[in-house]
Amino acid sequence: MEVMNLIEQPIKVTEWQQTYTYDSGIHSGVNTCVPSVSSKGLLDEDDTCGRQYTLKKTTTYTQGVPQSQGDLEYQMSTTARAKRVREAMCPGVSGEDSSLLLATQVEGQTTNLQRLAEPSQLLKSAIVHLINYQDDAELATRALPELTKLLNDEDPVVVTKAAMIVNQLSKKEASRRALMGSPQLVAAVVRTMQNTSDLDTARCTTSILHNLSHHREGLLAIFKSGGIPALVRMLSSPVESVLFYAITTLHNLLLYQEGAKMAVRLADGLQKMVPLLNKNNPKFLAITTDCLQLLAYGNQESKLIILANGGPQGLVQIMRNYSYEKLLWTTSRVLKVLSVCPSNKPAIVEAGGMQALGKHLTSNSPRLVQNCLWTLRNLSDVATKQEGLENVLKILVNQLSVDDVNVLTCATGTLSNLTCNNSKNKTLVTQNSGVEALIHAILRAGDKDDITEPAVCALRHLTSRHPEAEMAQNSVRLNYGIPAIVKLLNQPNQWPLVKATIGLIRNLALCPANHAPLQEAAVIPRLVQLLVKAHQDAQRHVAAGTQQPYTDGVRMEEIVEGCTGALHILARDPMNRMEIFRLNTIPLFVQLLYSSVENIQRVAAGVLCELAQDKEAADAIDAEGASAPLMELLHSRNEGTATYAAAVLFRISEDKNPDYRKRVSVELTNSLFKHDPAAWEAAQSMIPINEPYADDMDATYRPMYSSDVPLDPLDMHMDMDGDYPMDTYSDGLRPPYPAADHMLA
């Protein structure tokens, strides 16, 4: 059949979305034929008839374009040469000869002669393929200048026909390599694609670039020819096959061509890609979302562009509505990248991202589950007030039973944040055996602070300020968690973990039944040791006039406050009170009354208030000269501090002479109790005032992302689940850790 007749036949178009897969071609190395344009005859390979194949290849150019007599003679000689080589090397390979072999075969049977001839036939076939490959390359190379000229023709009909021919050539490996080696032809294809308004021409030219993009040489040729801006322009095409060719070609460029990401960004590729999230073809969406991930990773400007174009909403919608695993995985990768962007995080959460991601935590795809877990963890610090997370919380509690380090890191971190300042979530986790699961996670974690620290923080949240807090406090003891928790106070544990553990111990001490186990675990000597060490370190900086530095994001003043506060609660028990007194702590507590930090003054006055209930301790407090600072604290702006100071003064004045007692009484009345009879009564009876108490002292924890390339630092919030306001001297942040993640390929 002649070439021009073939070209003029209607092009058979099939639904490309039914045929293409997520692999855009370069991964498998398959010489993918363009699924949307198929034509029989032109450049089709006929393995059984070498002569017919070669003749078709020859006539493609003798009739497709006007040629000189010399060209015709050249191609005829080329055809004759190939035919002579075939007949010389494989005399049985012609159409007539091969038909004889078939004619002798009995239907359904293979003769011994045919079996013996199989190796010979295979060799002949290989030689024929080799000859045909050479023919492809020679003919394509010969035709390139003329095809380039035709692509630049002013007649759109000529351009369309030339594009069809080049498209067919791009489907065969040998001719495709010849095309890649011609910068002029690739540039002509790019220009044609960019300037055409004809849909068939657009389809053919994008198909050509798609086929070339399966090879690194082709990617480089497209890039150098300015193909990226042209391909980005094609993302606005109404033809789905054109969209597919454009997005898969861009995908291959982003994956393997250096400089492609910047070129796509400069061509406003993100602005064109984000609206494509509204398409409804899962496989097309999988490639599109992977392009977004490649562009957004490590580039803050790209993340903001995605946000400005409604990307978070589109991505969450995909996670909510689709079940195609590759699409869910690629989409979760984009969300994971965006989830470390402070601007994108609230947008994802407000779009229902937490609930949409939670749907897939029970998926059979480990990589999807892991991406969802990391993304949930990253988002959880801005989702503490989100509703409808009951199922997510239950699944996270169940995930604590697995041994995978990444799963445990994500589950504990997310639970820690979602139980912060959320009484409903605390109650739900406690009622679903969350305390027991967290303790077991701590026991299995060993020295992995990325698991232990958020688990301790979550326990600290569960043991205070919600209806089931007392149940949680008892559950820690009943599940043998107290010894393991007290051991976490030992150095060289990281200071953030130590700080969180101190807060948890204070909460556990609120339950009287926990006092004996805490004492048996030697918690008081460890707290006192930490207190002395932290205070000495803080004092050195005060004496030197330098600002208190952070150690792993924790200031020593925070440790001083935490230890003193925990000892205050423990001192409510008579046995603990005696042990604290015997450790010679009163001089240090009196010293803390002079602190410039209001919170430290309060907890120091509070622990002295408890110790002063015993006469021996009260005398020791007086002997240390505590009266003067306590008198000053009567005028404190903090009512709790003033009340504790008044109670201590009242207690140590009991054995003083009448004049001293009268002076103290007048001072107390004038400064504190003039308008508050209840406070006066409390001071007289030594009943501690129900002053809210800070138990949340944790800083941000270390960002990690399962086995993925280092992403942006995770910005976790300062946990504020305490009973009194955040420390005014701490911003709750620690320097970012070195990234230790790698993107899943």
Swiss-Prot record:
Its main location: other. Glycans are attached at residue 14. Keywords: Acetylation, Cell adhesion, Cell junction, Cell membrane, Cytoplasm, Cytoskeleton, Glycoprotein, Membrane, Nucleus, Phosphoprotein, Repeat. Transmembrane segments: none annotated. GO terms for cellular component: actin cytoskeleton; adherens junction; apicolateral plasma membrane; catenin complex; cell-cell junction; cornified envelope; cytoplasm; cytoplasmic side of plasma membrane. Expressed in the heart (at protein level). ARM repeats lie at residues 132-171, 172-215, 216-255, 258-297, 298-341, 342-381, 383-420, 423-464, 470-510, 512-551, 574-613, 615-661. Gene3D superfamilies: Leucine-rich Repeat Variant. It comes from the Eukaryota. Residues 574-661 are annotated as: Interaction with DSC1. PROSITE patterns: ARM_REPEAT. It is a peripheral membrane protein. One of its GO terms (molecular function) is protein tyrosine kinase binding. The modification N-acetylmethionine is found at residue 1. Residues 132-297 are annotated as: Interaction with DSC1 and DSG1. GO terms for biological process: bundle of His cell-Purkinje myocyte adhesion involved in cell communication; canonical Wnt signaling pathway; cell adhesion; cell migration; cell-cell adhesion; cellular response to indole-3-methanol; desmosome assembly; detection of mechanical stimulus. It holds the Pfam family Arm. The modification Phosphoserine is found at residues 99, 125, 182, 665, 730. It is found in: Cell junction, Adherens junction; Cell junction, Desmosome; Cytoplasm, Cytoskeleton; Cell membrane. May be phosphorylated by FER. Belongs to the beta-catenin family. Homodimer. Component of an E-cadherin/catenin adhesion complex composed of at least E-cadherin/CDH1 and gamma-catenin/JUP, and possibly alpha-catenin/CTNNA1; the complex is located to adherens junctions. The stable association of CTNNA1 is controversial as CTNNA1 was shown not to bind to F-actin when assembled in the complex. Interacts with MUC1. Interacts with CAV1. Interacts with PTPRJ. Interacts with DSG1. Interacts with DSC1 and DSC2. Interacts with PKP2. Interacts with PKP3 (via N-terminus); the interaction is required for PKP3 localization to desmosome cell-cell junctions. The entire ARM repeats region mediates binding to CDH1/E-cadherin. The N-terminus and first three ARM repeats are sufficient for binding to DSG1. The N-terminus and first ARM repeat are sufficient for association with CTNNA1. DSC1 association requires both ends of the ARM repeat region. Common junctional plaque protein. The membrane-associated plaques are architectural elements in an important strategic position to influence the arrangement and function of both the cytoskeleton and the cells within the tissue. The presence of plakoglobin in both the desmosomes and in the intermediate junctions suggests that it plays a central role in the structure and function of submembranous plaques. Acts as a substrate for VE-PTP and is required by it to stimulate VE-cadherin function in endothelial cells. This is Junction plakoglobin. It comes from Rattus norvegicus. The gene is Jup.
